[in-house]
């Protein structure tokens, strides 16, 4: 029992300890509440202090907003505190979880530490005892002592000399026997047996000594393994010459021994080879080893040159030890050899001689002078394998060239004969011994690069001779050329054999720029293609020649540009022409060459070939200070020849591209072809047969040439500007050659008797070396027209075809335009011809203002003008003939309008060159005539304008607003003038508008204006009565017309929508409800439309006496809408009054028809809720209105429509009563529309106005 009790007590006391409680980083909740309370008190205190300080500075809204923000922030903080307090109720459980997590992490750490400690126990292997040495124990047991090395501490006995000599003799005997019995000794072995070893020599390669390890005589190769040969010693039979420091291959006295480390490695390798392959394997191994060492010595010398010589950076070396091959890529900085395209290979040929192969730009070189010099250096004599016949080498690809460093050492295309075996060799002395020469790699590179540079310059020289003469290019040295780059300049062009780059001696900036381009890859190749592509040497030479031509081009262009700049020509470098535009210029040269080839086939070889000229040329653009902005002198020069070509052209920029709109080439005559006319000579100029060239030599580009070129170019520009202006005006003309025409013949042919005031002046030629002619390309034919250029003045004559310029009845089919350049900046223009059958006032004011003179006696007129070119020629839109043709247009308009007015019997009160005053009569009211002024256009693009006699303009700002009738008529004129302007601007798509039709329209529109005038008069009369009378009756009337606030109930206005559409608007004002200040304004719109009605009368010559005119359609449809239902009584009154008028007019017409026995008219059928075909459809523009109005010859029948059933009975009754219709007295009802003649318009308007007054009176009652 005590034990059990004791055990129980131990169990209770050994219970597990409590989990440790975590209190780190925990803050009591009381502290948080304390801190937040203090912070809230601090913020409230600060806010109250701030608000008390800014009482006067801030508004109450801003202060309240500030205090509200503080309260909101504090509220958010206390919400967080409240959240923490709520969470505190369950914080004990969370704390237990934290304690558990911490305890689990501690237990995990203890278990991991236990695993690491257990694993560390395996690292005590070194503390174990070693195993027993059984082998040593057995030796002791068996021999009585361990077998230990002595390390030569115990000296052995030396061999005696006799023993050694005996052994060596035995070895010599064994070696002699074995060499005698062997059949596979290499042919190149030269061996000697002595001193117990066999000394084997291979000339110019190596010497090796071998021996055997026993005295066995081996006669069977299969038993060779029983007694193999062993390596004794080795040395190279070549090396560096201590006297010259160069490599010697043909002197056996110079040898090279291997260092100890290399000797040991070679001994081990040779013994293995002798054991497995015998002497043949020995030869192959040492032969390769010797060749590798030869190539190594060469590579070492090349590396020395690459570091410490002038060759540094100018060649690349690729040394391959596994193939005993060296590839030297010279001119490594040049793009031609950048990818190993020009290189020399050094290696061992099939005869074991040091040999080479030379590749120039991817082609194998064989048999040229450079190869002969290299053969002497390498002591080689070449012979072709095909019995001495030289074969061409194939071009290798880029991949093959790059892989050339991996080629086989056997050069199968050629063989080499060592000079020692040739008794005829030049390097053999009199004793028959070969003179040993050191191999100089610097000399090898010099020979290669010099010969390559020489071949390039020779090819450049030969190709330059095909383009230039021998005086322009000559060979100074194998590496230098003398070039004639301009008539007065020459330079030396050379190549640097060391680098392969070209250069000029004492270069100018232009030559330096060309040198940089020559030594750079062609621009056609990108950087990627340069690294990957193969650039043939022929392409490089062609590119060099092109750049030389470009140099000549730039130098010649600079000289020409300097001469032009000194003679006041301005260069323009902005213009860049495309190939298509340049072809327009070269087309002149092609046509001229074809023409010269046809005319003179024998001398065509003496001219410069056009194809060579066009291969390289440059175009420059020049202009004079006073020239128009788009005119230029074009100069073309070529790098092949010193000749230059000249054009005068107009060039403009269209959508960013420069376009040649017109051009003329200038042609030149030689001195032997010069011909001048005497001042009094009037016969036709015949061109002599002379050679005409499009180019001029550089020697003739002197000051006199450019002075004459300036005058000629200016004349050609003026000539073309006039030609173009005539073409823009669509005027047909013929340009006469002033040098060849006869005045009397021309004028007599066209019956022109006028003596020209400006006689043709005698012009003299300027004494210059070259006569300048111009070829005109305006004609489509291939013939070339020549103009004598060296003149001080310019004269020209045009025959103008009088198509629409003047009426043929009053003039002639041909007019004359004379142009003369009086001075350098003054040009005289004159247009003259016949003018008859017309009497026009031609005052001195017209002559001075319009430069127009009319000679009625001689039936002749002329318009002249003097133009100051210094002020107008440089304007962008200069029209030299503007004044002349504006005056001619005004004269043409005056003649045509007067002719129309006279034929139509319109009263013309006055006329001049500016205005025509006419009288328009009102056929319905004789007291309403109007005086209209027809203002003639100032410009050819302007139209005529209509003005009232008492007004000077059609704008409403200057019209007297007190006269409403004048205002409305002026508005009509404004619409007409607008239509005339639009018709003029679109004249190519529209028909001509007759002035008679316009005048007739003004006559027909008068009744409408008079009707509106009558309405305004009635309203004015009522207003006057209401304002002056104060009795009861008048007060009652005033209350009818006015509202209680004094505002009138009725207003009237006329809206002119278009020329054929007008609108009568009655504005009805009324009070709404009991509020007297609130006014509602309604409007009643009545549309008036003009409709043609010509089929009852035939037109005659006098339109004012004609009864035919327009009908008026009055429509109420726009007013019969839902908003106007409250005016139902008004419309009933209107329709009632109009129906009464219809009945009255019907009776009058019937009575009048019976009394006058007029021709019965067919009844017009009623229409159903739609417009008749007579009703003109409203147009969308003024042009359509007046065009339709002007057509008076078309008869339009009303469209028949089915009437409604409730209208048929009234229609039948009306048609019976109106059996005949008078054309001048028509009044027809069409549902809610009315069709009436002009004389009934006043009655209809009166009835409508009276109805409005009746409605107002009923409303008042």
Curated annotation (Swiss-Prot):
The keyword Ribosomal protein does not apply. Keywords: Activator, Nucleus, Transcription, Transcription regulation. One of its GO terms (biological process) is regulation of transcription by RNA polymerase II. GO terms for cellular component: core mediator complex; mediator complex. It is found in: Nucleus. Residues 1-21, 413-435, 1193-1220 are annotated as: Disordered. Residues 417-427 have a biased composition (Acidic residues). InterPro entries: Med14_N, Mediator_Med14. Residues 1-11, 1205-1220 have a biased composition (Basic and acidic residues). One of its GO terms (molecular function) is transcription coregulator activity. The keyword Transcription applies. Coiled coil: none annotated. Its main location: nucleus. It holds the Pfam family Med14. Component of the Mediator complex, a coactivator involved in the regulated transcription of nearly all RNA polymerase II-dependent genes. Mediator functions as a bridge to convey information from gene-specific regulatory proteins to the basal RNA polymerase II transcription machinery. Mediator is recruited to promoters by direct interactions with regulatory proteins and serves as a scaffold for the assembly of a functional preinitiation complex with RNA polymerase II and the general transcription factors. Component of the Mediator complex. Belongs to the Mediator complex subunit 14 family. PANTHER family: MEDIATOR COMPLEX SUBUNIT, MEDIATOR OF RNA POLYMERASE II TRANSCRIPTION SUBUNIT 14. This is Mediator of RNA polymerase II transcription subunit 14. The gene is MED14.
């Amino acid at each position: 029992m005590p034990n059990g009790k004791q055990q129980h007590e131990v169990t209770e006391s050994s219970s597990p300890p409590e989990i440790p409680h975590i209190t780190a980083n925990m803050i009591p909740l009381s502290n948080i509440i304390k801190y937040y309370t203090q912070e809230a008190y601090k913020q409230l205190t600060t806010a109250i202090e701030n608000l008390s300080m800014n009482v006067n500075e801030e508004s109450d809204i801003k202060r309240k907003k500030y205090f509200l923000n503080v309260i909101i922030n504090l509220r958010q903080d206390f919400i967080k505190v409240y959240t923490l307090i709520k969470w505190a109720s369950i914080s004990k459980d969370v704390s237990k979880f934290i304690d558990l997590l911490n305890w689990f992490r501690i237990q995990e750490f203890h278990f991991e530490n236990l695993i690491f400690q257990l694993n560390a126990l395996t690292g005590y292997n070194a503390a174990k005892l070693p195993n027993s040495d059984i082998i040593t124990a057995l030796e002791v047991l068996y021999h009585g002592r361990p077998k230990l090395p002595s390390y030569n501490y115990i000296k052995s006995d030396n061999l005696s000399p006799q023993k050694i000599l005996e052994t060596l003799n035995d070895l010599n005997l064994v070696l002699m026997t074995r060499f005698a019995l062997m059949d596979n000794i290499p042919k190149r072995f030269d061996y000697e047996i002595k001193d117990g070893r066999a000394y084997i020599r291979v000339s110019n390669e190596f010497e090796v000594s071998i021996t055997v390890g026993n005295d066995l005589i081996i006669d069977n190769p299969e038993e060779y393994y029983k007694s193999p040969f062993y390596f004794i010693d080795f040395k190279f039979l070549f090396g560096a010459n201590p006297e010259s420091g160069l490599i010697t291959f043909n002197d056996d006295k110079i040898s090279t021994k291997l260092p100890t480390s290399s000797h040991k490695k070679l001994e081990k390798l040779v013994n293995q080879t002798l054991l497995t392959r015998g002497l043949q394997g020995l030869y192959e191994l040492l032969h390769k080893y010797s060749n590798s060492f030869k190539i190594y010595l060469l590579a070492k010398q090349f590396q020395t040159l690459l570091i410490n010589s002038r060759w540094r950076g100018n060649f690349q070396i690729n040394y391959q030890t596994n193939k005993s091959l060296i590839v030297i890529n010279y001119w490594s900085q040049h793009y031609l050899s950048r990818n190993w395209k020009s290189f020399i290979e050094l290696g061992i040929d099939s005869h074991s001689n040091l040999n080479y192969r030379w590749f120039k730009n991817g082609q194998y070189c064989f048999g040229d002078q450079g190869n002969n010099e290299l053969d002497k250096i390498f002591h080689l004599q070449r012979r072709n394998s095909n019995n001495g016949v030289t074969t061409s080498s194939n071009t290798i690809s880029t991949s093959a060239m790059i892989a050339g460093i991996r080629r086989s050492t056997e050069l199968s295309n050629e063989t080499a004969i060592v000079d020692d075996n040739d008794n005829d060799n030049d390097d053999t002395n009199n004793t028959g011994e070969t003179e040993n020469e050191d191999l100089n790699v610097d000399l090898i590179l010099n020979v290669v690069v010099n010969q390559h540079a020489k071949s390039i310059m020779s090819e450049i020289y030969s190709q330059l001779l095909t383009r230039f003469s021998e005086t322009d290019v000559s060979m100074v040295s194998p590496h230098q050329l003398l070039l004639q780059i301009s008539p007065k300049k020459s330079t030396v062009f050379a190549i640097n054999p060391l680098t392969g780059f070209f250069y000029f001696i004492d270069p100018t900036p232009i030559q330096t720029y060309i040198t940089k381009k020559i030594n750079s890859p062609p621009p056609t190749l990108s950087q990627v293609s340069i690294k990957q592509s193969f650039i043939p040497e022929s392409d490089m030479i062609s590119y060099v020649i092109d750049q030389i031509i470009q140099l000549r081009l730039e130098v010649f262009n600079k000289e020409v540009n300097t001469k032009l700049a000194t003679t006041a020509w301005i260069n323009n470098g902005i213009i860049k022409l495309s190939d298509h535009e340049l072809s327009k210029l070269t087309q002149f040269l092609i046509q001229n060459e074809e023409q010269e080839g046809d005319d003179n086939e024998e001398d065509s070889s003496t001219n410069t070939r056009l194809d060579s000229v066009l291969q390289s040329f440059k175009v420059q653009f020049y202009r004079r200070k006073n020239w128009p902005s788009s005119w230029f002198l074009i100069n073309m020069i070529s790098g092949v020849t010193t000749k230059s070509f000249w054009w005068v052209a107009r060039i403009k920029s269209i959508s960013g591209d420069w376009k040649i709109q017109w051009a003329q080439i200038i042609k030149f005559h030689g001195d032997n072809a010069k011909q001048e006319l005497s001042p009094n000579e009037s016969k036709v100029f015949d061109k002599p047969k002379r050679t005409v060239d499009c180019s001029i030599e550089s020697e003739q580009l002197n000051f006199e040439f450019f002075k004459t070129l300036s005058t000629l170019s200016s004349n050609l520009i003026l000539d073309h500007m006039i030609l173009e202006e005539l073409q823009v005006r669509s005027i047909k003309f013929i340009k006469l050659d002033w040098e060849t025409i006869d005045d009397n013949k021309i004028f007599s042919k066209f019956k022109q008797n006028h003596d020209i005031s400006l006689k043709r002046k005698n012009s003299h030629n300027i004494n210059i070396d070259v006569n300048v002619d111009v070829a005109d390309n305006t004609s489509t034919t291939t013939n070339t027209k020549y103009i004598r250029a060296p003149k001080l003045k310019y004269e020209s004559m045009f025959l103008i075809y009088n198509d629409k310029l003047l009426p043929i009845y009053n003039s002639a089919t041909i007019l004359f335009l004379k142009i003369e350049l009086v001075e350098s900046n003054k040009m005289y223009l004159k247009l003259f011809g016949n003018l008859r059958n017309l009497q026009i006032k031609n005052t001195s004011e017209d002559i001075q203002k319009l430069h127009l003179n009319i000679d009625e006696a001689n039936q002749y007129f002329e318009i002249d003008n003097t133009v100051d070119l210094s002020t107008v020629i440089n304007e962008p839109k200069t029209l030299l003939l503007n004044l002349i043709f504006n005056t001619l247009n005004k004269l043409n308009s005056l003649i045509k309008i007067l002719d129309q007015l006279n034929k139509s019997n319109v009263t013309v009160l006055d006329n001049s060159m500016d205005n025509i005053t006419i009288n328009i009569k009102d056929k319905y009211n004789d007291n309403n005539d109007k005086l209209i002024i027809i203002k003639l256009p100032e410009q050819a693009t302007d139209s005529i304008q209509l003005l009232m006699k008492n007004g000077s303009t059609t704008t409403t700002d200057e019209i007297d607003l007190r006269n409403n009738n004048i205002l409305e008529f002026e508005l009509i004129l404004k619409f007409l003038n607008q239509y005339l302007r639009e018709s003029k601007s679109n004249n190519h798509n529209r028909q001509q508008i007759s002035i008679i039709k316009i005048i007739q329209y003004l006559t027909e529109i008068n009744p409408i204006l008079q009707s509106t005038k009558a309405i305004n008069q009635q309203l004015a009369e009522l207003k006057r009565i209401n304002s002056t009378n104060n009795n009861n009756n008048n007060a009652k009337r005033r209350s009818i017309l006015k509202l209680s606030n004094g505002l009138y109930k009725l207003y009237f206005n006329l809206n002119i929508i278009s020329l054929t559409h007008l609108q009568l608007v009655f504005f009805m004002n009324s009070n709404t409800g009991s509020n007297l200040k609130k006014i509602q304004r309604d409007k009643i719109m009545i549309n008036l439309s003009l409709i043609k009605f010509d089929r009852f009368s035939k037109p005659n010559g006098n339109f004012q006496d004609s009864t035919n005119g327009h009908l008026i359609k009055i429509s109420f449809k726009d007013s019969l809408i839902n908003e106007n239902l409250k005016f139902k009584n008004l419309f009933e009154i209107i329709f009632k009054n109009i129906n009464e008028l219809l009945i009255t007019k019907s009776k009058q017409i019937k009575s009048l028809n019976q009394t006058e026995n007029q021709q019965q008219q067919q009844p017009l059928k009623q229409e159903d809720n739609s417009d008749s075909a007579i009703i003109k459809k409203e147009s969308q523009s003024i042009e359509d209105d007046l065009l339709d109005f002007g057509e008076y010859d078309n008869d339009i029948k009303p469209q028949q429509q089915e009437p409604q059933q409730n209208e048929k009975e009234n229609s039948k009754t009306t048609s019976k009563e109106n059996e005949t219709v008078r054309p001048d007295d028509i009044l027809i009802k069409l549902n809610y529309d009315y069709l009436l003649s002009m004389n009934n318009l006043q009655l209809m308007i009166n009835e409508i106005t009276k109805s409005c007054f009746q409605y107002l009176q009923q409303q008042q009652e």
